[in-house]
C-alpha cells in the first residue's frame, strides 16, 4: 500500500506549481518551477489513476450489500483488485528520487585497457556500438576527440551524446568491458582476452561548478595521428591539467580554439562526476555496490565472440545475441540494468 498522505502532498505541490505558473511567476523562478512541474506531472497522472481505481473498488464492494447489484459487483471486483498491485508498483517507481543528471547529455570516454592493439580494436568496436545505439534512439552523437591506433583501432575517444534519456540509459555502461576472441593478427587461431574502459559522465554546464583559472595549467602541443606522426605543423593540440585533482584532459583536433572548448567540456564533466560520486558515497556506502554506481575499475561485461555471447556480470545476464549487440542493439541489456537498479533503490527506500 502506498501512503496516501504522501500522495496528497505531491498533488498539493503540483497544484501549487500549476497556479504559480498560470499566475505568471517571476522570470528568475520560471525555469526551476517549470522543471519541477514537468517532473511531477507524470507522477500526478499515476496518482489520479490509482485513486480512481481505489474509489471504483470501494464503490463495487459497497454494492455487495445491495441484493440487486451484488451480481454485478462480484463480476467487477476481481478485475479491480487485480489492477491495483500493478498501479502501486508503477507509483513506487514514479516516487523514486530522480537523478538530476538523467536529463543531461552524456560525455562518453573510451580507452583500450590490457591487450595491446587488439584492445585498441575492441575499443573502436565499442565506440561504433554506442554510435549505432544512439542513432537508433534518435539521439545526436558527436565525436569530440579521436586518437586512432596503427591498425584502425583507437587509443582514446571522446563523444557527446544528446537526446531524451541519453545519460539515464548510458550511465550503466561505465566500467571495464572484456572481450574474448581470435584477433585478426593471430595466425594460429588462438583466443585472446583484452579489455577496454568506458566512462559515461553527465555533461556539466559552467553554472554547475566554478573552475578558477589558477587551478588550470594549459599546454599546447602538436597533434599526432596514428603511430605518433604529426598531422599538422602547428601547436593546435591542447592539454589541460586541473592542478587540485591532477585530472588531465587532452584534445587534438585541428583548431586550437575548438580543442580548448572540448577539453574544458570534458574537464567540467569529470569534475562534476567526481562531486556526484562524493555526494553519493556520503549518502550511502551501500550505493557503490549497486548497478549505476559507475565504478570505472569494475569489470562489468564480457563479450565472447566464439560463443556469440555477452554476459553482464553485475546482474548475471547472459544473451546469445552478440552480433546484434555489437551492431547497437543494447535495448534489452540496458532495460534489464535499469529494472535491476530500480528494484535496488526501491528496496533501499522501503527498508
Curated annotation (Swiss-Prot):
NCBIfam families in the cross-refs: prfA, PRK00591.1
Family (UniProt): Belongs to the prokaryotic/mitochondrial release factor family.
Post-translational modification N5-methylglutamine, affected residues: 229
Biological role: Peptide chain release factor 1 directs the termination of translation in response to the peptide chain termination codons UAG and UAA.
Origin superkingdom: Bacteria
Major location category of this protein: cytoplasm
The protein's name in its UniProt record: Peptide chain release factor 1
Subcellular location: Cytoplasm
Phylogenetic placement of the source organism: Bacteria, Pseudomonadati, Pseudomonadota, Alphaproteobacteria, Rhodobacterales
Assigned keywords, A-Z: Cytoplasm, Methylation, Protein biosynthesis
GO CC, alphabetical: cytoplasm
Modifications the protein undergoes after translation, according to the UniProt entry: Methylated by PrmC. Methylation increases the termination efficiency of RF1.
GO MF entries: translation release factor activity, codon specific
Cross-referenced InterPro entries: PCRF (IPR005139), Pep_chain_release_fac_I (IPR000352), Pep_chain_release_fac_I_sf (IPR045853), Prokaryotic/Mito_RF (IPR050057), RF-1 (IPR004373)
Amino acid at each position: 500500500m502506498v501512503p496516501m498522505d504522501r500522495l496528497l502532498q505531491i498533488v498539493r505541490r503540483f497544484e501549487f506549481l500549476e497556479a504559480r505558473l498560470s499566475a505568471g511567476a517571476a522570470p528568475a523562478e520560471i525555469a526551476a518551477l517549470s522543471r519541477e512541474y514537468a517532473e511531477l506531472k507524470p507522477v500526478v497522472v499515476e496518482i489520479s489513476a490509482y485513486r480512481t481505481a481505489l474509489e471504483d473498488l470501494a464503490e463495487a464492494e459497497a454494492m455487495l450489500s445491495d441484493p440487486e447489484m451484488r451480481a454485478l459487483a462480484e463480476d467487477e471486483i476481481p478485475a479491480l483488485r487485480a489492477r491495483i498491485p500493478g498501479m502501486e508498483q508503477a507509483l513506487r517507481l514514479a516516487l523514486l528520487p530522480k537523478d538530476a543528471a538523467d536529463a543531461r547529455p552524456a560525455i562518453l570516454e573510451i580507452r583500450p585497457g590490457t591487450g595491446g592493439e587488439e584492445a585498441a580494436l575492441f575499443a573502436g568496436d565499442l565506440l561504433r556500438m554506442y554510435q549505432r545505439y544512439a542513432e537508433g534512439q534518435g539521439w545526436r552523437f558527436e565525436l569530440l576527440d579521436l586518437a586512432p591506433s596503427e591498425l584502425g583501432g583507437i587509443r582514446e575517444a571522446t563523444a557527446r551524446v544528446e537526446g531524451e534519456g541519453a545519460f539515464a540509459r548510458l550511465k550503466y555502461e561505465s566500467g571495464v568491458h572484456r572481450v574474448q576472441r581470435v584477433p585478426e593478427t593471430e595466425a594460429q587461431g588462438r583466443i585472446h582476452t583484452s579489455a577496454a574502459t568506458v566512462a559515461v559522465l553527465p555533461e556539466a554546464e559552467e553554472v554547475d561548478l566554478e573552475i578558477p583559472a589558477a587551478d588550470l595549467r594549459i599546454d599546447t602541443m602538436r597533434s599526432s595521428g596514428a603511430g605518433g606522426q604529426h598531422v599538422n605543423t602547428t601547436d593546435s593540440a591542447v592539454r589541460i591539467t586541473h592542478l587540485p585533482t591532477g585530472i588531465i584532459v587532452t584534445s587534438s583536433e585541428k583548431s586550437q580554439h575548438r580543442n580548448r572548448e572540448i577539453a574544458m567540456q570534458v574537464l567540467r564533466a569529470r569534475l562534476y562526476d567526481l562531486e556526484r560520486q562524493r555526494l553519493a558515497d556520503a549518502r550511502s556506502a551501500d550505493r557503490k555496490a549497486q548497478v549505476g554506481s559507475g565504478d570505472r575499475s569494475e569489470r562489468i561485461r564480457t563479450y565472447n565472440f566464439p560463443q556469440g555471447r555477452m554476459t553482464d556480470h553485475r546482474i548475471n545476464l547472459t544473451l546469445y545475441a552478440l552480433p546484434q549487440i555489437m551492431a547497437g542493439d543494447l535495448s534489452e541489456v540496458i532495460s534489464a540494468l535499469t529494472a535491476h537498479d530500480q528494484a535496488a533503490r526501491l528496496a533501499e527506500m522501503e527498508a
